[in-house]
């Protein structure tokens, strides 16, 4: 039976999103007073889809995840996956309180540090280690600073067959 790449992507996203929601520092810096259980941050502040909807998310901090892959050759057993993480917030929320775990950092820079700590060199989401390949400061628009990060992960190709 061949590996289903879409199923592999869904599984990777689930592991990544869960690790973000289980990180008390990420939960603290996202600072959503409407959420009591960190698992409720999914689809509120942490999205397993690419999400840039600044009208709805005007005063919110968001982490969204996208996973893509390149086509593999018929002979490839291992396939490269790219995990893209977009972190953005409104300009008004960039500064974090001095008492926060993120003191001395902007909100998106601190969240990027935590994401990198969780994903870079992680062996939880693929075969071998995930590797950070880009980490770029950007903005969604004039009111929403952002950080884009890309990790490379190896997984099984759809050509791989269990024996």
Model-derived segments and their meaning:
Residues 1, 5, 99-100, 136:
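Residue-level detector of alpha-helix boundaries and kinks
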Residues 1-75:
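Small/polar-rich, solvent-exposed N-terminal microdomains that initiate assembly or binding
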Residues 11, 60, 80, 106, ...:
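Short, well-structured alpha-helical interface segments that form or flank functional binding sites
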Residues 24-28, 104-159, 163:
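Acidic-leaning, charged glycine-interspersed low-complexity segments
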Residues 32, 89, 97, 127-128, ...:
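Short linear functional motifs in flexible/disordered or boundary regions
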Residues 60-62, 76-82, 142-148:
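A general secondary-structure signal for short beta-strands and their flanking turns/coil
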Residues 65-97:
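Active-site-adjacent structural patch at catalytic or cofactor/ligand-binding sites
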Residues 94-107:
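Short histidine-centered catalytic/ligand-binding loop motif
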């Amino acid at each position: 039976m061949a590996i289903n790449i879409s199923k592999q992507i869904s599984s990777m996203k689930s592991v990544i999103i869960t690790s973000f929601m289980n990180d008390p520092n990420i939960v603290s810096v996202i600072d959503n007073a409407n959420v009591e259980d960190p698992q409720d941050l999914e689809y509120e502040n942490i999205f397993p889809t690419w999400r840039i909807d600044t009208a709805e998310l005007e005063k919110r901090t968001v982490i969204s995840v996208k996973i893509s892959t390149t086509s593999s050759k018929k002979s490839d057993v291992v396939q490269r996956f790219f995990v893209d993480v977009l972190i953005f917030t409104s300009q008004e929320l960039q500064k974090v309180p001095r008492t926060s775990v993120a003191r001395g950092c902007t909100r998106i820079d601190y969240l990027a540090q935590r994401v990198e700590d969780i994903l870079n060199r992680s062996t939880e989401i693929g075969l071998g280690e995930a590797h950070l390949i880009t980490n770029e400061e950007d903005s969604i628009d004039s009111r929403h600073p952002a950080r884009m990060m890309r990790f490379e992960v190896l997984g099984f190709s759809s050509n791989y067959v269990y024996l």
